[in-house]
Amino acid sequence: MKSKIWVIFIILFISVMSVNQANEFNHKTKRVPAEWEPQEATWMQWPGYWEKDNEIAFAKIADIISRYQKLHILFHSDQIYVDAHKALNDIGVDPQGKNIRWHAVPYDNSWMRDNGPVYVLNDDEIRIQNWNFNAWGGAFGPDIPFNLDNSVPDKVGTILDIPVDHIDIVHERGNLEFNGSDTVILNWSTIGDPNRNLNYNKKQAEHDLKEYFGVKQVIFIEGIPDGDLTKGHIDGIARFIGPRTVVVLQCTSRSLCRPDSKDAEIYNKAAKIIEKAGFNVIREPIEGFVNHKDLMFDTNYMNWLVGNGFVIVPGFGNPKTDIMAKSRIENYFPDRDVYLIEMLSSWSAGGGVHCHTNDQPAFSVSN
């Protein structure tokens, strides 16, 4: 009798272990690639009439990206298509070049990082996640439309023939930093914003993020830098540059945010949280500030875009700080060509090159 009980016990033990191992396997195979991994393409939503000031920078960004990899450009009217072609022709870029694809897709704004797809590899299958988007919790006022933006991931999924999963949580990809294996860093002040997700809590958010992204570790920083209408997107504060290394912004005596300011406290606390989680931290100093159309803001170069062999960095038209930043970022990415593009109009509206672009990992199938 005892021997039978032991046999049953062993069978049950093996069954439980097998289930746990299967769950662990599934957990490990679901992941979001890091931005420095090989990419299939980059996507952009060309600016419309009310974002016309961004068009020159868009053309320059498109020029650089299309030299290295495919670029998909969305346009939502015949006039935008014409304007985009003219902007590219004006700087000597063939709008119908071999790496450029055009798609007539309706959308509301040119910030595709935030309303665009999140690509997830799950058991060797690529899937798109479409998180809810409500124009940054209504931060820019009730008149800013966003319903068309919300449908963009579905349109991209149709173009690429990739299945789309709808996530009933309001969030933006600009607040997600992945190391490509086991960790995501994000700002709780964004996803926990009651104008995005009412009555949402950290425990539930951590569970959801692990479930949807396959990560084992969720690192929350907190705090909203002065003037940040996104309520603290992580891609302006802390960026992975390797599986175990994170660059974190730092106020200096030369920046508007002083070393003893609230913003400095946000960045310093973020660095400590990330370091405590087991990562190497490099501080990215803010070396100055600029004045653009009576708006003053710090020269924050964190909003860079990484692609196949290149990095594009938002420039501020300040030769001294631009040159210093380019040198630092070349050290972060020694195997890539680094470009700076002056993007003061975009920055005054709340973002840079990373905010305007959406990278598609190389494991997906592109038309």
Kindly label every feature range from the protein language model:
Residues 1-5:
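Positively charged n-region of N-terminal signal peptides that target proteins for export
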Residues 8-16:
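Bacterial N-terminal signal peptides
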